[in-house]
Regions:
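Short, solvent-exposed loop/helix junctions and linker helices
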Residues: 7, 99-102, 195-199, 233-236, ...
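Generic recognition of well-ordered alpha-helical segments
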Residues: 107-110, 155, 159, 203, ...
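C-terminal substrate-binding subdomain of Rossmann-fold SDR/epimerase-dehydratase oxidoreductases
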Residues: 20, 207-333
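A conserved pocket-lining segment of Rossmann-fold NAD(P)-dependent short-chain dehydrogenase/reductase
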Residues: 90, 142-143, 180-234, 261
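Alpha-helix initiation/capping motif
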Residues: 68, 130, 142-150, 194-198, ...
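N-terminal Rossmann-like NAD(P)+-binding domain of SDR-like oxidoreductases, especially those catalyzing
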Residues: 1-184
């Protein structure tokens, strides 16, 4: 039986990845969750335990020592999600973001080296690309000067990993640059569960559909087909599956250090997303147009051909699946 350590495993993408890890049967895999629940909801653990077996939880900050855990378990691979992730919050609390996101990664890399853990998947972000002139973006697209402390922690994290791999050739690392994960598990049992007021687009839309509260669309005069920002939305279950694919890829490719985009390859505007949500779910969204928000990227979408080539990964779910699953989850809350 393989044992996988998932840091931040109670979070949005982490919890869906755990379901993917245990999808083929819990007799083949044991999952250890390392999470301090600072930005995740403990209720997710209850839901996971109802859906799968072989999940153990350690309520621990990733910056603290985990030697006792690693001594008691032979870890075959690590998926490192644990990080602070709100762009706006990072601007207001930059030192907290640098401390948490960088030091937790350093601690995990040090543990991998000392305990001979040879596979690591790192949660990175498309925010590293910023505004680009040529679309779609691939892994060779020049990275921008990060627009937020959050994005900068991901850029520094990737550089730290590159240096680490250069000096530890027996350890493989794949950094996955997510585009815009949305949606929820098809069961409706888990999904995005913000512990404060939602900031991400689909939870905000769901909240508006549920309560009638007016949501804000920031800008409708951008140089796009309808004036609103365009993003590459990808179903969270597709994102989750890529982490399992990455572990499988590293099991037969020792000493690699790769960066891989995860996106659908299709750009969808904010207004198109709202319209699709309304049509698929039979609801009306109360929204208003506000001024454009400083720092927002106008449009971005991914070339994910490298993911298909190396991991055999491609998206299974479309935008209709994303909005329907998100609404199903929201109604179950």
């Amino acid at each position: 039986m393989k044992t996988i350590l998932v840091t931040g495993g109670a979070g949005y993408i982490g919890s869906h990845t755990i379901l993917e890890l245990l999808k083929e049967g819990s007799e083949e895999c044991e999952v250890l969750i390392l999470d301090d629940f600072s930005n995740s909801n403990p209720l997710i653990i209850n839901k996971l335990n109802k859906m799968v077996n072989n999940v153990k939880v350690y309520a621990r900050d990733c910056r603290d020592t985990i030697d006792d855990i690693l001594t008691n378990h032979k870890i075959d691979g690590v998926i490192h999600f644990a990080a602070s992730k709100a762009v706006g919050e990072s601007v207001n609390n930059p030192l907290e973001y640098y401390d948490n996101n960088i030091n937790s990664l350093l601690n995990i890399l040090d543990a991998c080296k000392r305990f001979d853990i040879r596979s690591l998947v790192f949660s990175s972000s498309c925010s590293l690309y910023g505004d680009v002139d040529k679309l779609p973006v691939n892994e060779d697209t020049e990275l921008s000067d990060p627009q937020s402390p959050y994005a900068y922690t991901k850029l520094v994290g990737e550089r730290i990993i590159s240096d680490f791999c250069n000096s530890n050739s027996n350890i493989s690392v794949v950094s996955l640059r997510y585009f815009n994960p949305v949606g929820a598990h098809e069961s409706g049992e888990i999904g995005e569960y913000p512990i404060t007021k939602p900031n991400n687009i689909l939870p905000v839309i769901c909240n508006s559909a549920d309560t009638g509260e007016e949501m804000v669309v920031f800008g409708d005069t951008y140089d796009t087909r309808d004036g609103s920002c365009i993003r590459d939305y990808v179903h969270v279950s597709d994102i989750a599956r890529a982490h399992v694919d990455s572990l499988n890829y590293m099991s037969s490719n020792v000493g690699i250090c790769d960066v891989i985009n995860l996106g659908s390859g299709d750009g969808v505007s904010v207004l198109e997303l709202i319209k699709t949500f309304e049509e698929v779910n039979g609801v009306n969204i109360n929204y208003k147009i506000s001024d454009a928000r400083e720092g927002d990227i106008v449009q971005i979408y991914s070339d994910s051909s490298k993911a298909k080539k190396l991991l055999g990964w491609e998206t299974k779910y479309d935008i209709k699946d994303m909005v329907s699953s998100a609404w199903k989850w929201h109604k179950n809350l």
